[in-house]
Regions:
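Active-site-proximal beta-strand elements of phosphoester/diester hydrolases
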Residues: 22-26, 125-127, 172
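His/Asp/Glu-rich mid-to-C-terminal helical/loop segments that flank catalytic regions of hydrolases
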Residues: 179-211
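Proline-aspartate-enriched helix->loop->beta-strand connector
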Residues: 45-50
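A C-terminal functional module that forms or caps the active site or interfaces directly
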Residues: 132-178
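Mid-sequence, gly/pro-rich, charge-dense loop/helix-turn segments that line enzyme active sites
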Residues: 58-145
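N-terminal short beta-loop-beta anion/metal-coordinating cradle
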Residues: 1-44
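Alpha-helix C-terminal capping segments
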Residues: 39-43, 61-62, 160-168
């Protein structure tokens, strides 16, 4: 395994399931996530980007511990309405949201069912913004405007960077809370559990990816 340090991040390059991989923790927020993704593409020539993490549920049917696999992602805090753009639309971009790779999404859903059969898996839009959503008003806004299933702080930036570079991507989120400030278990406990599930899930996806 080789470790590369750049932009205050550590990139671990090696082999998993017979595939060359680079594992990195981007840090919190959209800027960190976008920088991390661009480094993966520029320096490590990533052919696929898979991001795992946690998110808050925006759907009454999606409970803590469930998994949301992205169909597409959007910036819920992007607002250029004054210039004639709809909420969420990035000015001068041809995409309103960034669509995940269909093949990766199908692999992930199947892998979730096989690796964690007791965990519910949902496919839907994930909304990202540079804020931790614990306010009902913000939650209602994101649901009404975008119909998102989950909300977090990095996914859309990763998706945008990958989209601009024509690199297939997927975002997978374990639900840690209801995006209303509530939680059924303490965060460190959930984080450890989610990390273990994400690792097993990623291994299975890697095993099934062709090439």
């Amino acid at each position: 395994m080789e470790i590369t340090r750049k932009a205050s991040m550590e990139f671990y390059a090696g082999v998993l399931e017979g595939k060359k991989v680079v594992v990195v923790r981007s840090g919190i927020g959209k800027v960190n996530a976008a920088i991390c993704t661009q480094i993966l593409i520029d320096d490590f020539h990533a052919e696929v980007v898979i991001n795992t993490g946690i998110a808050g549920s925006l759907n009454a049917d999606i409970n803590i511990g469930d998994i949301v696999v992205s169909t597409d992602l959007i910036h819920h805090d992007m607002n250029a309405v004054a210039f004639g753009y709809p909420v969420g639309q990035i000015p001068q971009m041809d995409a309103f949201s960034f669509h995940s790779d269909d093949a990766l999404r199908k692999l992930a859903v199947q892998a979730c069912k096989e690796v964690n059969p007791d965990i519910e898996v949902f496919e839907g839009r994930i909304a990202s913004g540079d804020q931790f959503v614990a306010d009902q008003g913000v939650q209602d806004f994101v649901v009404k405007e975008f119909g998102a299933y989950a909300v977090e702080m990095e996914g859309a930036a990763i998706a945008q960077a990958a989209y601009l570079n024509n690199v297939p991507f997927l975002v997978i989120r374990a639900i840690s809370d209801k995006a209303d400030g509530s939680a059924e278990m303490d965060y460190p406990t959930f984080e450890a559990m989610a990390a273990e599930h994400s690792f097993k899930l990623t291994l299975r996806i890697l095993k099934d990816i062709q090439g």
